[in-house]
Amino acid sequence: MSQLDRRNFLTASAALAASASLGRFAPAQPAAAGWAQLVAGNTAFGLDLYGQLRTEAGNLFLSPFSISAALGMTAAGARGKTLEEMTRLLHFPADAHAAFGNVIRSLNEEADPKKRGFTLSTANALWAQKGYPWRAEYKKLVTDAYSADLFDVDFLSAPEEARGTINTWVMKETRDKIKDLLPPGSVTRDTRLVLTNAIYFKGDWQAPFEKKATKDLPFTLADGTKVEVPLMYRVGSYLYAENDAFQVLDLPYTGRRISMTVILPRKPDGLPAVEKDLTGGKLDAALKTLRYEREVHVHLPRFKVEKSFRLNEPLQALGMKSAFAGADFSGMHTGGEQLDISAVIHKAFVDVNEEGTEAAAATGVVVGTTSVAPPPMPRYFRADRPFLFLIRDNTTGSVLFLGRLTNPKA
């Protein structure tokens, strides 16, 4: 096949999490059909991918859910070896697309933030070369399962205009936080399809950190260097666990459906060992050890992280190879051209600060009312060294965001 017969498409995803202040864990609801396997697979994929990215220096932040959704729409049109590799990479169950539909609808339900106390939305779109022979059944699958919008664009005649249109859509879906997802040169006259996912989350903590309690204090980097950063402080009742290697704290947002879980190694240089050892099973086991503690003294840095990734090499290292060269995406189209993925692009942003709603400040569970009850043993969770954090949907169990903070000032 000549080079002129080879065409490409892009898979892109964008994620934003903006958060503020502190509360209590919401018990997970029984998973709908297909949720459990899909969610476990998404978590496993996210940690596999994180394992490839963790060798990069500095802070990290990504949305495993966003990347999995974008690749899921792509896999829906894959066949043969390409489909086998993508299914294995994504840990997809047999009913993955239908299960994704259930999860996406659950995440987007009651979109009014006044009803559930936070804003969470996920949006998918398929940007197709107009006039190209796309299969109607493929379009129906991605619209039904992934709630994707379909847009006809003209990559052939106006690739830069198409890129601008897609980037504008991403900006709108992420409330102007993710800009220029597709960089110059990523869309060309050879592009035939771009698949995008955007996920946006903004939540207030159940009970706020008071700004007057935030102080500039030392944060110890992995090499022992100390930097002054704003450390927020609050004492209250939280889900907490610890072992010899790390401490775990769960910090739910207003509405209690979404929470941030922080995994804090005991030592400033202990993060690489925790990262290397973390699997979906071990993460689940750690979460199951969380117990309410009546008095937890929490120090947490105020921070922002923005990261961009071109995921071609990490995905190929995990076994998704044929999708980038010699792919079989015949489930998408009836054209005679060879379609390969040219790039998988992901961009994510997180903002953590003190802000919150004072209306729901009662967060603890008081056990025992007799005068002889022993006083609670105070716990101290001082995140003044590198740590892992993830933002989870407690209803479906989905890991929406996953990150690492090594330096709040970076």
Annotate the PLM regions:
Residues 2-16:
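N-terminal secretory signal peptides and thylakoid transit peptides that target proteins
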Residues 23-45, 49:
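C-terminal segment of N-terminal export signals and the immediately downstream linker at the start
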Residues 43-63:
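N-terminal targeting/tethering segments
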Residues 57, 96-268, 273-274, 284-375:
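Non-catalytic, conformational "gating/processing" segments within enzyme and secreted inhibitor domains
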Residues 70:
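Short phosphate-coordinating micro-motif centered on Lys-Gly-acidic
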Residues 73-77:
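Alpha-helical support elements that line or immediately flank enzyme active sites
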Residues 87-90:
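Primarily short, surface-exposed interaction patches in extracytoplasmic proteins
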Residues 348, 354-410:
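C-terminal soluble interaction/assembly domains
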